[in-house]
């Protein structure tokens, strides 16, 4: 096909060349007959050059020589790549081998060592509890005498609020206030709330006994003497001041749930009077009624 196309192109070029030569010849003869010869020679040379230039078309034959493209077959020789893939699974084998590392067995061994010092810790806790109990007993003995002036102060304020006769005279009342404040300052902050509850509890017991005395038509005594006598009766041996529900058998079951409004009234009065009078901090949880104060009778 290529040879046929080349021959056809040559025929077309030859015909066009002959036509181009024939057309200008009759036009040039009438104008300048002397110049016709060089003009004829120029196109003749050009005509001779056309076939010469057309002849190099056959070098297109080397294109079929490009058939060596099948030389791409050597790419298939690159298949040895799967060969290096074989060693990759080989190093995976040593990874499961380091599993024999079992140092974890040594960890349970030191654990019994930690359990051993836990035993003296329990003994320390017992000692601390014993020390706390001893401190509470000491505080109870101290509170026996410290709560008496504070109780008298609250009784004085309670009697004034209800319009009854005063418990103490004004001169003695000022001294009682000073004693009460000095004693509250010595009480630890953690024990002040319970001390105030004991004061309220003692006041309620005092009121109950006073009502019983009135019912039995006993001789009435001044309230000041009754307070001091009852203070000696309630705290003769240091019992009943700090934990009346446990150490004072007379106080157990004495305050009934029906007396809760009265207890709250006196407690609020004590919380308003004592901290402001003595400039003492009372914890806010002191507004909660202590457990074991109210009996079931």
Curated annotation (Swiss-Prot):
Keywords: Allergen, Repeat, Seed storage protein, Signal, Storage protein. Residues 29-55, 68-80, 102-127, 234-250 have a biased composition (Low complexity). One of its GO terms (molecular function) is nutrient reservoir activity. The keyword Signal applies. Residues 29-127, 234-257 are annotated as: Disordered. Gliadin is the major seed storage protein in wheat. Residues 56-67, 81-101 have a biased composition (Pro residues). InterPro entries: Bifun_inhib/LTP/seed_sf, Bifunc_inhib/LTP/seed_store, Glia_glutenin. Pfam families: Gliadin. The alpha/beta-gliadins can be divided into 5 homology classes. Sequence divergence between the classes is due to single base substitutions and to duplications or deletions within or near direct repeats. There are more than a 100 copies of the gene for alpha/beta-gliadin per haploid genome. This is Alpha/beta-gliadin A-IV. The keyword Lyase does not apply. Substrate of transglutaminase. Residues 1-20 form the signal peptide. It comes from Triticum aestivum. Belongs to the gliadin/glutenin family.
